[in-house]
Amino acid sequence: MASLKKSLFLVLFLGLVSLSICEEEKRENEEDAEDENHEEESEEKRGLLDFAKHVIGIASKLGKRSEEKRFWPFMGKRSEEKRFWPFMGKRSEE
């Protein structure tokens, strides 16, 4: 009977040890997965910021272009408009 108790305790002890080792590995894997997810999220944010900067840059270029060609699109820049149409603004000395 005593040997049966010893072997039963030994089996239970080894089972608990292996269970705790598996739980530790599972926690480590979850932490690694969280770190990878965090890195992916930060890369996505960086990608979105780069895309937003690119879109803003294009929009500002388009805004400048539309401002230059607002009145007479076939004439060119506003400085050229003033040269050809002095009554629209101050006369340039060019």
Swiss-Prot record:
Residues 30-42 have a biased composition (Acidic residues). The modification Leucine amide is found at L62. It comes from Litoria fallax. Pfam families: FSAP_sig_propep (PF03032). Fallaxidin-1.3 shows no antibacterial activity against Gram-positive or Gram-negative bacteria. Does not inhibit the formation of NO by neuronal nitric oxide synthase. Has no effect on splenocyte proliferation or smooth muscle contraction. Fallaxidin-3.2 shows antibacterial activity against the Gram-positive bacteria E.faecalis (MIC=100 uM) and L.lactis (MIC=500 uM). No antibacterial activity against the Gram-positive bacteria B.cereus, L.innocua, M.luteus, S.epidermidis, S.uberis and S.aureus, or the Gram-negative bacteria E.cloacae and E.coli. Belongs to the frog skin active peptide (FSAP) family. Brevinin subfamily. Its main location: secreted. Expressed by the skin glands. It comes from the Eukaryota. The keyword Lyase does not apply. It is found in: Secreted. The modification Methionine amide is found at M75, M88. This is Preprofallaxidin-9. GO terms for cellular component: extracellular region. Residues 23-46, 66-70, 79-83, 92-94 form a propeptide. Residues 1-22 form the signal peptide.
